[in-house]
């Protein structure tokens, strides 16, 4: 299995999101935005239904997504931040016949099935290639990007480990993909 990289440059993150917006691909825009802002694995993300994020009785977004992760079987609570909610709103306003059990990332094939992981992979991989984003970029890159960008903002690795539901700090450190440029930046900023 090849190693995937996080998207290190914030400009590249924005270009990836804008790529789908400009093309009017709101499902793909929302998929990327939610993946970047929730740290969910793509398999868990694609299974989301509108009732997981939206309270139809109160007509408002839920504060958190409560999900049992497919890989770890652990229950996790993820806050829906404003960026995630805004992307969901764009898609919600565009979606015809919205009902609670409707898949958020609905495939054109079948009545109410999500796109599959390989389709999501191809969507993200192709966009990264078209945009010239450096690294081996895939669906898992979006999860890694969350951790990398959180770490760059000063979030302690132990907290990122907890968010990821990792069993060890070593796994989280590998996810962060810290490279020589990151190490050099620490030395440049010390100036003691």
Please state what every model-predicted region is.
Residues 1-13, 74-82, 98-101:
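DNA breakage-rejoining catalytic core of tyrosine-based enzymes
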Residues 10-42:
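Basic, Lys/Arg- and aromatic-enriched nucleic-acid-binding interface segment
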Residues 44-46, 136-137, 147, 155-166, ...:
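Active-site-proximal segment of tyrosine recombinases
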Residues 48-50, 74-75, 112, 152, ...:
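Catalytic phosphate/metal-binding cores of nucleic-acid and nucleotide-processing enzymes, i.e., regions
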Residues 67-69, 164-189:
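Catalytic-site neighborhood detector that most strongly recognizes the C-terminal catalytic loop/helix
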Residues 70-89, 101-124:
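C-terminal catalytic core of Y-nucleophile DNA break-rejoin enzymes
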């Amino acid at each position: 299995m090849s190693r995937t990289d996080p998207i290190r440059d914030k400009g590249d993150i924005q270009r990836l999101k804008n790529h789908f917006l400009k093309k009017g691909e709101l499902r793909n825009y929302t998929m990327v935005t939610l993946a970047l802002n929730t740290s969910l694995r793509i398999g868990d993300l694609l299974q989301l239904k509108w009732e997981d994020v939206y309270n139809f009785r109160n007509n408002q977004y839920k504060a958190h997504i409560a999900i049992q992760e497919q890989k770890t079987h652990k229950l996790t609570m993820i806050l829906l931040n404003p960026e995630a909610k805004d992307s969901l709103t764009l898609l919600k306003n565009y979606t015809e016949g919205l009902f609670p059990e409707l898949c958020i990332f609905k495939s054109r094939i079948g009545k109410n099935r999500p796109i599959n992981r390989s389709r999501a992979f191809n969507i993200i991989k192709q966009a990264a290639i078209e945009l010239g984003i450096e690294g081996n970029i895939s669906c898992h890159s979006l999860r890694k990007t969350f951790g990398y960008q959180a770490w760059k903002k000063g979030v302690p690795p132990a907290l990122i480990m907890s968010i990821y539901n990792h069993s060890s700090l070593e796994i989280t450190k590998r996810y962060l993909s810290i490279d020589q440029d990151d190490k050099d930046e620490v030395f440049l900023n010390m100036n003691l």
